[in-house]
Amino acid sequence: MTKIGDKFPDFNLKNQNGETIFSEDLKGSKSIVYFYPRDNTPTCTTEACDFRDNLEDFNELNTKVYGISGDSEKKHSNFSNKHSLNFDLLVDEDYQLSEKVGVYQLKKSFGKESMGIVRTTFVLDEDNKVIHVIEKVKVKTQIEDLKNFLKE
């Protein structure tokens, strides 16, 4: 698992509009990079809408927000449009970045095991160094936890 003090891995991923976002694009401001299992599921939708509703506060804290899952560009586009999301959703269909940061793991759900993204959030500094990690995210408290961390 990528941890505090590590450089976030380099990447180039498409967003919901088909534009390529490079890890270099994140430099110059802090970034929240949150990994989530799947578009249009209840908890993932709540999480995305929480970021949407608080984006202005994160902007005031000079912090960008990026969501990443294994969904396709088309699914991201539909999800973003349906919920009026105001930040980039990045496509990691082959799970390469998810594997590099250690969030693509064996999960148990309803007694079944399968590989998938474990909900995890990273905060990066202006040089893409990891300065905060939230593992096993609690969606209800995540936004306030992130704001409090960024205000310190």
Question: Which ranges hold each PLM region?
Answer:
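Chalcogenol-based redox active-site neighborhoods
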Residues: 1-152
